[in-house]
Amino acid sequence: MRRPARDHQAWLQSQTWSLYELGDLPGVAAVTYGVVRAGRHDPQGVPLLQARDIVDGTIAQSDPARIAEHIHAENLRTRLERGDLVIVLIGRIGDSALIGEDQVGWNTARSVGLVRFTEVGRAWGVDEWLRRWLKAPEARGWLSRHAPGSAHATLPVSALRKLPVLLPPLDRRRHLLHGIDLIEQRRQLNTQRAAHAVELADAHFERSSLRPADALSRPLAEVAAVINGVALPKATTGQDASIAWAAPAEVLQSLGPYLDRTARTMPAPERVACAQGVVLVAPRPGEVKAVISRIPVVPGRGTAALRAGNDLDGLWLLHELRSRSRGLGAIAQGVQAREISVKALSRLKVSWPDTEVRRSFARVASLLHDRAYTALKENHVLGELISTELSDGVPSHYRTALPG
């Protein structure tokens, strides 16, 4: 039974451990989800926050989708306010971010859960604690078990409301939040360093690709093997699931132009298994994203792999596709432009200057990418440290009491 709001402050000041369902957590005013029928993109409309916009604890979207004013007016319950916590409900279940001034007045898509807090909840840090708790192994495990689906796991908002939230004693909660704040400051610095290094590599490519009008351009299939993605087998019984399988979402949602881990593996098929260094490509409405795989990988259905003759040429292709990301709609197909046309991709004309130009570019770009990737790898380690901090010290009886 939900406690009266007047009791919330007392519970939030408690010096004992407590376990709640999210919908009953003191300081939480509402748990809901976004617009079900958003309609078509309206360039003059209200920004719509989508699951893809929530990346690594931030809202990473400078060009959001937009909905018509009348649709927004019909869905004012999900009009974003400062301090709201938004949670991914499809795909990367549980990724979250707090809304800042820049997103006030936006609306939210069906793929996003919305948690609104009371004034007391914000004053006692329930918003900050919940955002961190969603990174705890216990919370991650619970969410994955309650999100049915394979290619696009989906968490119903009814399940989100039942998420177990462990509330530590006030002093311990404050101590944990302070330590995690320090870790996140380091992660933010690393993210900025990585972004700046990649921006420098993009700028170097732009200078390197300036050439006379008659300089050579070639069909992509002439400079790289174009490999179509495959579906994940339904079962791998008796087979060694030995190689990473990259879903389109993992390419699209990767941090930086790198893929170094996937959620699933499969037996390595000879025709489509790719060594590290391959360029992976995946489309979504309005753009195509390209990343370099840092691990051996099989491209999943809805993606394609580009296997250049060497890693240096792979870097050139990566930046060629990055520079044209929003102009490659012709290689996307399907109702939602989420399938890739390998034929169209193979025919795509790419700039291909002489070997010395490509090598000269790659010598500089590879150093910048190494710097960016090192920073992002450290962020992964720091993320694991946050999970450990959240999990350590949980009383054993609560660890076993967390429902599955």
Predicted regions located by residue number:
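A short beta-sheet element
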Residues: 50, 75-78, 82-135, 269-272, ...
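Sequence-specific dsDNA recognition surfaces
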Residues: 20-39, 53-82, 221-236, 244-276, ...
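Non-catalytic DNA-recognition/assembly elements of restriction-modification systems
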Residues: 1-33, 162, 166-234, 351-404
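Short, small-residue-rich loop/turn micro-motifs
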Residues: 52-55, 90, 159, 247-252, ...
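Extended hydrophobic-aromatic, low-complexity segments
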Residues: 291, 314-316, 328-331, 357-362, ...
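A short glycine-rich beta-alpha junction/loop motif
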Residues: 105-113, 148-177, 297-304, 335-359
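Short coil/turn segments at secondary-structure boundaries
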Residues: 35-43, 63, 145-147, 216, ...
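Short, positively charged
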Residues: 125-163, 313-344, 403-404
